């Protein structure tokens, strides 16, 4: 067994709210979570290999150990914007909110990731060619529209390369001025049926979808009214 490492370059702004955030607000995470990565792999498996193969492979994908190597720089743009959302109560006839959707204001954050994003998967057999094929098919991470481009074919390595952080694993040291964020992952109880958006089954935060407090090696370098600039801390 070895580590399987893939590097992606963001080709669009990244955005991914924490699992507990509401639809009208919430800060964006600075990196994709293991949960988001595994859902992207599952999506690639369903599209390229079919639902039957994806269902059979899901327990293996779900239990993967995921490590991240963040881009060297990240710039977060924050703003308020208008969106349309379903009306919970019927609006008065003739009002500007008449119809199934109403206008409201929400808070949004978008992250510009400067540099390659590394993903590593632990305890992977060199014979697992299917996982390699699915990593080739990932084209976005986080919120839909956060497009990424694979920089080179995934490679195997005996040890985890430097600058990678294992989400949910034991931590021997971390930067004192790092950024703490909650990165979610799949619990062992998350079945393929619940992971499928077509089954109607819900995924419960804190049960099938668990969070890990993770110190990201980012240091705030500069900030203003509408932006925050982070730089990766390299030991």
List each language-model region with its residue ranges.
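Internal, well-folded beta-alpha domain core
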Residues: 49, 53-235
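N-terminal ordered "arm"
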Residues: 1-53
């Amino acid at each position: 067994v070895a580590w399987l490492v893939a590097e992606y370059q963001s080709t669009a702004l990244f955005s991914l709210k924490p699992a507990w955030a509401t639809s009208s607000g919430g800060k964006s995470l600075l990196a994709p979570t293991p949960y988001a990565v595994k859902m992207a792999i599952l999506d690639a498996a369903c599209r390229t290999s079919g639902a039957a193969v994806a269902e059979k492979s899901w327990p293996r994908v779900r239990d993967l150990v995921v490590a991240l190597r963040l881009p060297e720089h990240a710039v977060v743009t924050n703003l308020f914007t208008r969106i349309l959302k379903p009306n919970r109560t019927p609006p008065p006839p003739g009002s500007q909110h008449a119809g199934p959707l109403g206008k409201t204001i929400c808070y949004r954050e978008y992250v510009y990731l400067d540099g390659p994003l590394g993903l590593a998967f632990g305890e992977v057999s060199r014979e697992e060619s299917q996982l390699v094929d699915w990593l080739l098919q990932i084209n976005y991470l986080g919120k839909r529209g956060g497009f990424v481009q694979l920089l080179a074919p995934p490679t195997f390595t005996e040890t985890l390369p430097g600058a990678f952080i294992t989400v949910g694993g034991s931590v021997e040291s971390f930067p004192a001025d790092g950024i703490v964020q909650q990165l979610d992952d799949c619990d062992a109880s998350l079945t393929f049926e619940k992971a499928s958006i077509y089954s109607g089954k819900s995924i419960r935060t804190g049960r099938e979808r668990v969070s890990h407090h993770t110190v990201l090696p980012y240091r705030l370098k500069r900030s203003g009214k509408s932006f925050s600039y982070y730089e990766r801390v390299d030991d």
